Amino acid sequence: MKNILLGCSMLLAMTAYASEPNRADVLREKILSGDTSEVLVVAHRGDWRYAPENSIAAIEHSIAIGVDIVELDLQLSKDSVLFVIHDSKLERTTSGKGRISDWTADSLRTLKLKNGAGIRTMHSLPTLEEAMLVAKGHVLVNLDKADRYFDLLMPVLEKTGTATQVIMKGNKPAAQVDSLYGAYLDKVIYMPKLNLNKPDARELMDGYFNELKSVVYELSYSNDDAIGYAMELKSRLDGKALIWYNTLWDTQSGGHDDDRALNDPDGAYGFLIDTLGARIIQTDRAELLLDYLRSRSLHK
């Protein structure tokens, strides 16, 4: 009897553990529910200041320090295998030369990545499948340069069981998004990108808001000509969707960028959060942003 009871207790414990949501599930729910209690941090190209951009090591480091989303880029090999790399050519970030589309997957696997200073490292060029298996259960993944590959990447996401961890983005009009990708939008999160300085920004936004009903929007503006509309969107999206800003360079967020944050984090990150309603920020300085948010009790 004692052994039976012990066995039942262990089974119940294992069942409870298995049913607990993983961190990626929790983060996805924060976005879907419009949770504004914290600010989510996105590591651009997987935190390239620590390890080669778009590398497995960069993803692992991002997870270790508490990043919520890693942004990764996709390119396609000659034999239609998706690799995690930003440029269409190999020279800047790898030991290879030429266009990725001229190399087979097996040949790309022989290359080594370069670090931020352009020095060859021992890190290899990862496939999308390899990257998603590392991220699985730990962190959300924003796939950039990827909407052109939707039909190729979805089988990879299904195979790895990571489709619900992915945020896709693009700037096509709402009707086109629904026509091209509608079959996938119940799994991946689709995020419209909107440049507020462009003349058609309001028309595009109305389409996204009324037709797609997206749960997150990536907004950008280069100067104060668009600050009024940015503040208007803060009110319009309040309680309906989260706002994402990039602080990678000054023309993406009206000068409230990572470089400014080195000496004036309140004027950079604080402005985007408090004045423009940002609840997701993509950065090239993930640890700096995390420290700032934690000092304000805006991140665990």
Give the location of each predicted region.
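Positively charged n-region of N-terminal signal peptides that target proteins for export
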Residues: 1-4
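Hydrophobic h-region of N-terminal signal peptides that target proteins for export
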Residues: 9-18
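Phosphate-group recognition and catalysis centered on beta-loop-alpha active-site segments
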Residues: 17-300
